[in-house]
Structures are given as C-alpha cells and as structure tokens.
C-alpha cells in the first residue's frame, strides 16, 4: 500500500507540475516583461499540491516547474547562477506555501470560508514573497545594467514587484474560488 501512495504522490507532482508549466506558457503570451517575468497562474497548481500533500509536495512541484521551463527553453538566462535562482529556486520556494497544509485542510472540511481565505492568502503570500526575493536577488546581481543611475536593489525589487504583486492577487483569488467551490481538489481520497 505504501508503494501505491508514493506512486500517486509522484503522479500528482508530475501532472500538477505540467499544468503549472502550461499555465505559465499560456499566460506569458499575454505579456512578458523586457528582462523576463510575467503575470502568471503557474503558482496555482504548485500551491494546490502544497495544500494536498504539504510542503514536500509543493516544493517538489515547484522544482519540477522550474526544471520544465529550463528544459523546454522558456527562460531568460544570462548566467547559470541567475538561471538557478530565477527558475529552480524561485519556483521551488512557491511550494513553501504548503506549510499551511494542515490549516487549509482544517478550514475546508468542514468549510470555514473566513479561515480558508486567510490561510490560502497567507500561503500564496509566503510563496510569492519567497519567489519575489529570489527574482530580486537574481535581478540585482545579473541585470544591474538596466538600473541606470537608480539603486540596483530598489530597481530590481520594483521591476519584480510589477508582476509579482498582480500574480499574488490573481492566484489568491483563483485559489479561494476553486477551493470554496470544489474542496475535493485538496482532499485526498481515503
């Protein structure tokens, strides 16, 4: 039985990682920033996996998303360390929102809408903040020439906030709507 549970977990990681990649690909056609980055829905499947399986599921799904982006060539990489920070680290840490796994599970069954909204928003905020930090560090170190005479760290933070703040808001709203209408998305079958 343990092998079956692990297999289901890995299949879910693969499916949600692929969905995250496709959502990122589709939303990037709406508009991409000049030095990379865009408003994206890719965090939604990563956080759903975190809500289903905890931090381990979220981190692994985020890592797979970064790996798929890199393998498929949908990246802006100027240096290996920048690529590692902007893709592997940034998307892996989105899964840290899975730290709210138990709270989200408890808020959804039975449904306590206020608590669910609070914990989903907190999870999305944590994942977004950590992703924002990874992108900001990479931007400050590897895209400094675009800052001109502005302080590099402030320029990088403002640049990355321009798409990360809307991404956080949109993903939070979508997650709340999805989970309040279909709690089976995160409840595991017994």
What is the meaning of each model-derived region?
Residues 1-17, 122, 152-190:
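Alpha-helical transmembrane segments and their cytosolic interface
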Residues 27, 31, 72, 76, ...:
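Membrane-interfacial segments
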């Amino acid at each position: 039985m343990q092998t079956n549970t692990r297999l289901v977990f890995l299949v879910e990681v693969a499916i949600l990682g692929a969905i995250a990649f496709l959502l990122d690909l589709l939303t990037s056609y709406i508009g991409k920033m000049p030095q990379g980055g865009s408003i994206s829905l890719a965090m939604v499947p990563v956080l759903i996996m975190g809500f289903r399986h905890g931090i381990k599921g979220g981190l692994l799904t985020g890592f797979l998303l970064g790996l798929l982006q890199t393998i498929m060539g949908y990246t802006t990489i100027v240096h290996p360390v920048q690529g590692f920070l902007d893709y592997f680290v940034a998307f892996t840490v989105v899964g840290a929102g899975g730290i709210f796994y138990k709270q989200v599970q408890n808020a959804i069954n039975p449904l306590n809408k206020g608590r669910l909204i609070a914990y989903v928003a907190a999870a999305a905020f944590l994942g977004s903040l950590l992703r924002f930090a990874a992108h900001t560090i990479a931007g400050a170190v590897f895209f400094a020439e675009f800052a001109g005479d502005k302080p590099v760290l402030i320029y990088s933070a403002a640049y990355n906030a321009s798409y990360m703040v809307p991404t956080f808001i949109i993903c939070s709203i979508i997650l709340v709507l999805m989970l309040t209408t279909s709690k089976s998305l995160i409840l595991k079958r017994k």
